[in-house]
From Swiss-Prot:
Protein name: Phenylalanine--tRNA ligase alpha subunit
Annotated cofactor note: Binds 2 magnesium ions per tetramer.
GN (gene name): pheS
Known partners and oligomeric status: Tetramer of two alpha and two beta subunits.
Upper taxonomic lineage: Bacteria, Pseudomonadati, Pseudomonadota, Alphaproteobacteria, Caulobacterales
Superkingdom classification of source: Bacteria
Amino acid sequence: MTDLTQLQAGLIGRIEAAADVAALEAIRVEALGKSGSISEMLKGLGKMSPDERREQGPKINGLRDAVATAIAEKKAALEAAELDRKLAAERVDLTLPPPPERRGRVHPTMQVLDEMIAVFAEMGFGLAEGPDIEDDFHNFTALNFPPKHPAREMHDTFWLPQNEAGERKLLRTHTSPVQVRVMRGTNEKLPAWIANGQAPPIRVIVPGRVYRSDSDATHTPMFHQLEGLVIDRNIHMGHLKWTLETFTRRFFEAEGVVTRFRPHHFPFTEPSCEMDVQCDRSGGSVKIGQGSDWLEILGGGMVHPNVLRNCGLDPDEWQGFAFGLGVDRLGMLKYGMPDLRDMFGSDVRWLEHWGFSAFQAPNPATGLS
């Protein structure tokens, strides 16, 4: 049998002299591989007599363990030396600027909505909210919509299937149902955050999502609306006119905006009107406060006596006005966005272009400036 001590010394010497991991792996295969010299010795133990196995077995196993330990230690030393070499060769320039951070942008709808809330907060308006899923009474009946009014039809309103009680809910077509909830006050058996009930005088705005079965470049099935409601004694159209003109000048940040009011019809107001602003439509864009064209931007009027009665208020004692405007549409006009549908897309590039820095967010306590 091969002199085990001499074999061990030779293998340990070669292991220590190995220059890299590849050379070390070759020695391991030669000694400990499937057909390696030490592996063959271990296989030969089966052919020995019991006395020879008892004598040679521990020696061969000791040789195998010594060689395996030497290989593992040498491999760790070679890998550490290679890492030190790479680290010594690398250079980090601490003066290089870091890669730019991608900051989030405030969506134009949220920016415009915050701007509107800030303007109305300056005029003393509070905030009210209501549910997106409404019933016929709050969305139509209480607001003086006749039973056969076109707005009740399927092509204008998203109706939900009947429930077990035979009632049909709908996605609200405007934020006006919150007017009813505010004026009815404690008569509404709803949580306080939905009911928003309060006794007159009332001065609130109601921002929120509304839903109509319509879709083109200037209409979407879901959009954002802001409703305004004032209830007090001796309220008249002059108060409505001042409120809307003041809002328009502050929102568009143009003192020279010219407005006009045209008679219109809404079931829930009487008299009713629409407000136009003077603008310039030349050049493929709309510029508010310039030119000689006119553009309708909102509607309003005096709260209809029937609506007041439906909400438990005496129209001989209380009067009020209401108005509604499209948040997304006014944002398009103010900032020149061409297609309303883009505001409901998911293109991050569009948001990076049209979005706002969080530092530009208006504050209801301080207004737009």
